[in-house]
């Protein structure tokens, strides 16, 4: 897990799995043995890799770790211990396992996935072809190379090595998306301490955003505030805070993207709403966050969990929105994903395919006291930028706030806790990438077919041996 941000030692991803394949998995001939050694490997990985969850919910961490372990261990247990199909089976198993992790439990827990560990390595660019699962497949190819080098199977290294080199070269050769316009954009970080809960007074957060914005001098076409940067008691359309933001957008002559904590009329629930405000006409559009954070914005199985956990920080549950994350503005359509949604490539894809020419990501990581979650959120933004061929503007309350180019380069980045406005020229783009056009399903289906073939081949070999 040291390949993951904030450590970012990307070679340890394929090297760690490759060493496990060579010295733990390779001799396991029976399916049960392979399942046991795979489960032991991933249990250790997720006990550490998902430990950040304990700051949000210890019961959630206890529930998630064994489920995540089993999800990754099961596909790897189907990979034969030897034979020519092993080299394809390992990448396929990793792809299939991670694809399932994006769906279950609790609607998916894609944090600490293998692709995040490669954003500082040479395979980041391949996300333009096949998204994060394509990057994960190359981690599997790299692991096979390490395994065969350790076994001194020199000749068997050739085709995996060709794949590991050729795919990134093909990604570099792919034409870029079309630049439609260049604008000056700013992302605002209000600042503050880490490790504060979600009930930090909304007024103080809003005032810190206003102070940072007012202190910034210069012309801005587009400005993005962080998640929960303001609030409303009841419908935000009638709130004083919206009127204040409309006045601010008009005064700065900028399109303003801000996020509201909107309490429902019954005060028992809330909506996480991101709005677009035009300088001339005021409120232009809104998007209500559709993929909610389990144990953060709602409690799965609340009646079961409540006797064993303090749920006072989640006294209100969020109401999920519907539809793609895209906001219509005077600059054109802007794709938006709120906070945790940036980890889900399909959500960003939906917003971009609905017309988004740039991606805005208001986020909030102040509930966590370390840099693990902020750095993984930034890594996710880098992956989403490459996949979509779009600039990504990530605005976090306490960091990291960043501007990311379509090749995954972080052109501007804040430090944690500081109050700052980051500004620069960005491009509004159109056009498709292969990852946008195809989505994740072709690679998932291919991985499933390869694993099914591995199982079938192993069964035939066993039948011949017994006969």
Where do the protein language model's features map onto the residues?
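Membrane-embedded alpha-helical bundles of multi-pass enzymes
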Residues: 1-173, 370, 381-384, 396-401, ...
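Soluble catalytic domains of enzymes that build or remodel membrane lipids, polysaccharides, and related
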Residues: 174-441
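Cytoplasmic C-terminal tails of single-pass
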Residues: 464-467
């Amino acid at each position: 897990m040291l390949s993951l941000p904030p450590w970012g030692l990307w070679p340890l991803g394929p090297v760690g799995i490759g060493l496990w394949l060579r010295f733990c998995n390779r001799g396991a001939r029976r399916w049960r043995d392979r399942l046991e050694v795979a489960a032991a490997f991933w249990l250790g990985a997720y006990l550490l890799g998902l430990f950040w969850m304990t700051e949000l919910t210890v019961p959630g961490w206890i529930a998630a770790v064994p489920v995540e372990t089993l999800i990754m261990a099961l596909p790897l247990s189907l990979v034969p211990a030897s034979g020519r199909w092993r080299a394809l089976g390992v990448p396929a198993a990793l792809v299939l396992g991670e694809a399932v992790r994006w769906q279950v439990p609790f609607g998916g827990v894609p944090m600490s996935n293998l692709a995040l560990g490669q954003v500082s390595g040479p395979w980041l660019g391949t996300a333009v072809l096949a998204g994060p699962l394509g990057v994960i497949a190359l981690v599997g190819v790299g692991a096979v190379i390490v395994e065969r080098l350790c076994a001194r199977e020199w000749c068997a290294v050739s085709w995996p090595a060709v794949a590991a080199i050729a795919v990134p070269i093909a990604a570099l050769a792919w034409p870029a998306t079309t630049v439609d316009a260049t604008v000056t954009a700013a992302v605002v970080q209000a600042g503050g301490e880490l490790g504060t809960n979600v009930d930090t007074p909304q007024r103080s957060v809003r005032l810190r955003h206003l102070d940072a914005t007012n202190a910034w001098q210069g012309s801005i076409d587009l400005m993005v505030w962080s998640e929960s940067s303001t609030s409303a008691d009841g419908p935000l359309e009638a709130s004083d805070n919206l009127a204040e933001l409309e006045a601010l957008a008009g005064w700065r002559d900028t399109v303003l993207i801000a996020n509201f904590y909107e309490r429902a009329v019954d005060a028992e629930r809330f909506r996480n709403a991101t709005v677009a405000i035009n300088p001339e006409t005021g409120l232009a559009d809104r998007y209500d966050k559709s993929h909610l954070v389990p144990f953060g914005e709602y409690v799965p199985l609340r009646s079961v969990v409540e006797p064993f956990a303090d749920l006072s920080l989640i006294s209100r549950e969020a109401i999920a929105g519907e539809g793609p994350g895209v906001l219509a503005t005077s600059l054109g359509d802007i794709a938006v994903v709120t906070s945790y949604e940036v980890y889900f490539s399909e959500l960003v894809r939906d917003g971009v395919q609905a017309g988004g020419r740039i991606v805005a990501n208001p986020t909030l990581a102040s509930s966590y006291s370390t840099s693990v979650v902020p750095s993984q959120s930034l890594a996710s933004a880098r992956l989403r930028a490459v996949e979509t061929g779009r600039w990504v503007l990530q605005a976090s309350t306490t960091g990291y706030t960043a501007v990311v180019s379509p090749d995954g380069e972080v052109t501007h980045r804040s430090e944690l806790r500081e109050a700052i406005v980051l500004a620069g020229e960005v491009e509004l783009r159109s056009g498709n990438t292969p990852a946008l056009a195809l989505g994740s399903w072709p690679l998932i289906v291919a991985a499933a077919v390869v694993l099914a073939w591995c199982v079938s081949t192993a069964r035939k070999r066993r039948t011949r041996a017994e006969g």
